[in-house]
């Protein structure tokens, strides 16, 4: 059975291989190519030639008469014509299946058609993967009478798809659709849904190297000019400033201008005004050192009859007196749409890969102008004019500019954006861009006036923030201070020049509801033209120190409805004056400011390459946080969510503070410590005092002080919970000090209204003397104040560490009570905590003692020695708790008054965990405590 099955399989394979060999003999290729084909290669070529034969035979059969067939070229004539073409011919269907690939492809791509189509019969197998979308979008069936398409594509120059090391070559493709109408073909025909495209491909890169000889350059130009067979073209030579020197005589046919007229004027004088920026940017990229020496542009050129002709120019930088050689292709508006959109998308992708920002003006120029109409949905851009993701940089310069010092002058020129080697200006525009023209101050900016000298003594008292953030770099400091690099301030110019200057597009999310960048609030603006105007209301010419008001972070604001912050304008008649040293923070008053950290420049860890990182943050002792409002929001909060810390971890933790706030906080802490020390001394009196106090006074302490209970407000209802704060205090003022003082006053009044300490009468027959000093007693911390929330108790200062040891040696008398007190005290609104000393692991081997119950009530804490068989006290009887346990339990909540912040390198959320103080053992003789370990 197995032998027969194995033999049948082998017989079938032999039969299939024989048929494939028969197909190889039928292929119209040379015997040398046939001998090196594999079975898969044979099948791929057979499919391609079969599709071509079916398509052309269908065209011949649909001819109405024999006279029409005689008008076609014969096979040999067509073959000679194709071989004489400058490029190569490509026929393919709408889905990318190849029908024909001329043999002349080997002259341009370096490999024959058999080598390129060996492992696939699709055009996507021989082009670069980055251009698959471009090819697919241009093979969409046309929806307009114009069936011509012009686009660029990179073809692989390797034999196999698996070998990509050989690179690729850029080819200009002009495609024409040969689709048939439904009446000419059957409704279910394959060619109805897959129209055939004939593509004339002309390589845009020359065959010779960049530094070839003159004869090689002439042969290269001659071969390039032959591409006008399917695309009108003329060749021209230019100097480094793009002034034309030589041009082909056919330029008079396309432009109506002879070579002498073109030679007498600059090339930029013939360009459309809307295309000047795009042309100058490509010109600069061509002359950039270290570049590839090649550039492309799509511009409109004025003809002799004052009309506009679209030119697709491919510029190549070579050596010699006229180093720039340009092949100029005359294209239509539809083709200009396609090529220009393709250039724009490629430049955007390149800028994202290289991490450099593209020019805003260039992105506008790369979009189609308003005069063009979209001929096809394929070439319709997403939006006309500025895109929705553009940023408004009319108020601040975020680009990394380079200042140049010319002629030993001390004046600083405005920053030039390095979209090319230096800027996006042409060589002629650079000569007149910074010239002073008083008659047109807004149309052409003038040179910046000499800066005001500022010495070190003048700014010695300014803090780090002022010197590095608010002091503009145009001010010369002698000797210079070690400040961070800053961009030059914005120059008020025309809209076209503003978009040319402020071109940095940061990789961040713009503010909600607007296109303003969060770092765009200016502090200084300069008017280099010298034209002065009275500043509007709210603007000053003096650098003043302001403090932003405190706003609730939970209330989201609308950036659109808020007015812009007042800026400081500096002109020649309004000199900059530095005020006296102060401790205020130099920030503008903003009605919708949520946190100062949102307005700071990005840090080195921020996403992006650093083009928009105008400076680095000063070293801050503490974690950085972003203020994020609580509660659900219908949209993300305004400002920037930086990756330094998660905004959900800790809300609203500012880290900049002034020296005055620090001193005020220290004073409040010291006063609070004194008050609590005085309060603690009232709790811990001498144990013998209870014997001297008359027992009749204890009757007043049996009922809680209801008046004091009512006098304490429920502060937790109107004052939010305070979270931990860093070492640096907030610059916004709050009612924290008032709140702490009110709590202290309430507690002091409550204590003053309570009677003196007295032993609680229980049962005279069951009274027992105090326990021996050798018997240890456990102090168990518990926390509850009737009528006072945990927030109020959390404002105690952490002085218990110093006061506990002082009071521990004085001894205390605890009251062991029955376990039934728990239910009674719970009914009274108290939260007791029971601790059995015998069951505690800390007291193994120590004589046990009755269980203790410690509670705290609004009345005065009383220490009462009671024997173990005591009847349950009344619900209103208060049980005492020492201040030691209260303060020990309140220690984790002490963050509102004290400045306890995590150190460098520690996680901030660890300081939000509540620390549990271990139980401590004290002896009545005051000998101290035994360590639990």
Curated annotation (Swiss-Prot):
Residues 74-148, 220-290 form the PAS domain. Residues 1-53 form the bHLH domain. It holds the Pfam family bHLH_NPAS4. Residues 295-334 form the PAC domain. Residues 361-451, 514-573, 750-776 are annotated as: Disordered. Keywords: Activator, Differentiation, DNA-binding, Neurogenesis, Nucleus, Repeat, Transcription, Transcription regulation. Residues 14-53 are annotated as: Helix-loop-helix motif. GO terms for molecular function: DNA-binding transcription factor activity, RNA polymerase II-specific; protein dimerization activity; RNA polymerase II cis-regulatory region sequence-specific DNA binding; RNA polymerase II transcription regulatory region sequence-specific DNA binding. Transcription factor expressed in neurons of the brain that regulates the excitatory-inhibitory balance within neural circuits and is required for contextual memory in the hippocampus. Plays a key role in the structural and functional plasticity of neurons. Efficient DNA binding requires dimerization with another bHLH protein. This is Neuronal PAS domain-containing protein 4A. It comes from Danio rerio (Zebrafish).
